[in-house]
Amino acid sequence: MRVDLFDFDLPDERIALRPAEPRDSARLLVVDPNAEMVLSDRQIRDLSSYLRPGDAIVFNDTKVIPAQLEGIRHREGAPGQQVSATLHMRAAPDRWKAFAKPGKRIKIGDRIQFGHGENVCALGALDAVVEEKGEGGEITLRFDLSGPALDEAIAAVGHIPLPPYIAAKRPEDERDRADYQTIYAREEGAVAAPTAGLHFTPSLFATLDAMGVERHFVTLHVGAGTFLPVKADDTEDHKMHFEIGHVDAATAEKLNAVKARGGRIVCVGTTSLRLLESAAAEDGTIKPWSGATGIFITPGYRFKTVDLLMTNFHLPRSTLFMLVSAFAGLDTMRAAYTHAIETGYRFYSYGDGSLLHRKD
C-alpha cells in the first residue's frame, strides 16, 4: 500500500509533553467500526464500561532502562569525538545493538567511553568497542562489562530515551523516570515505554478486578526502532526492526481458556498485540513463544486472536498508525484521528488513549 495513505496533518500543540494527572484522568476515544455510533468521547477511568466479566486484559510488563548513552569515541591517530548511542536490543550479556549519532563517522574497532566527567559511575567509565556497523546508524557495541554489572553501569550513566518529538521540545528530567514507566513494569530491557499502559492506576486495576476481568502479562522489549519514520513510499518496501519478547506457557493456556469460554482478549498497547499475533497459530490458539519478532501489520492482515486494542494516538505515516488502521479500518481511523485533532485530544507517548474494536 502507498505510505501516503497513512499521512495526516497534526498541529504541534496536540503533542503532549507531560502525562495527565492522575494517569486515569486522560481522555479515551472509543472507536467501534461495527456500531451505529462509531466514536464516543470518554475517560480512561471509564474503561470498565466497555469490558465484561470473563474478558482478559493483556499488558506488556517490560521495564524501560535508561538506554540513552553519551560518550567519547576514541580512535588511534584521531581526536576524540562526542557520540550519542541509543541502545535498542540486547544481543548478548555484553553486547547491545544501538543507533548512534553521528553514525557515518563511526568505524568498526572504534572504542567509545560512556560515562565520563560527572557521569562516571561507581564502576568507573563504561567502555565499549564497535563490533559491527549496519544501515541507518545502527551499530553493535561490545562492552567491557557483562550481565548484571553492565546493567548496573547503564542504569548509573544512562538517560531515559524520550521520544524524539518530546526530546525536541524539552530535556529529560527526573520526573520522566517515573512518568515514562508503567506501574506494573518488571522485566528490564525496553528503551521505549509501552505507552498505552501508562494510563493505568491501582484504582483502575481494583475496579477491573472487582468486575471479574482477568489480568495477564507478556513481555516485549520495545526498541528504539518504534520511533523510526517510514521512509519507503510503499509498505512492501519498509524494513521492520526486530524486538525480543516472550509469552510463557501458563499465560498462553489461560488466554486460550478465556477464548474458549467466550471471553474477549483486550490488548493494552500495540506491543502486546504484536506479540500475541506473533505467538498465535492460524486457528487463533496462542502458543508459548520466545524470540525476536518483526511482525509488520498493515490493512489486509487477518487478526487471529485479539478482539479489542487500547492504544495511544500515533505519528502520521508510522507503522503503528498502519496497525490501528488494519485493526479498525483505514477510513474509520482517519475519521477518528480527525475527530481527535478537532476536539483537543493529546497525542503520542504522554497523550490520551483510544479503545478500538476490531472491524468485523
Curated annotation (Swiss-Prot):
Gene3D superfamilies the record matches: QueA-like (3.40.1780.10)
EC number(s) from the headed UniProt entry: 2.4.99.17
Pathway(s) per entry: tRNA modification; tRNA-queuosine biosynthesis
Recorded superkingdom: Bacteria
Keywords: Cytoplasm, Queuosine biosynthesis, S-adenosyl-L-methionine, Transferase
Catalytic activity field: 7-aminomethyl-7-carbaguanosine(34) in tRNA + S-adenosyl-L-methionine = epoxyqueuosine(34) in tRNA + adenine + L-methionine + 2 H(+)
Keyword Iron: no
Compartment(s) of residence: Cytoplasm
InterPro entries: QueA, QueA_dom1, QueA_dom2, QueA_sf
One of the protein's GO biological processes: queuosine biosynthetic process
Any GO CC annotation of this UniProt entry: cytoplasm
GO molecular function annotations of the record: S-adenosylmethionine:tRNA ribosyltransferase-isomerase activity
NCBIfam families: PRK00147.1, queA
Role description: Transfers and isomerizes the ribose moiety from AdoMet to the 7-aminomethyl group of 7-deazaguanine (preQ1-tRNA) to give epoxyqueuosine (oQ-tRNA).
Subunit structure: Monomer.
PANTHER family for the chain: S-ADENOSYLMETHIONINE:TRNA RIBOSYLTRANSFERASE-ISOMERASE
Similarity field: Belongs to the QueA family.
HAMAP family named among the record's database cross-references: QueA (MF_00113)
Name listed for the protein in its UniProt record: S-adenosylmethionine:tRNA ribosyltransferase-isomerase
Organism: Rhizobium rhizogenes (strain K84 / ATCC BAA-868) (Agrobacterium radiobacter)
Species classification: Bacteria, Pseudomonadati, Pseudomonadota, Alphaproteobacteria, Hyphomicrobiales
Gene: queA
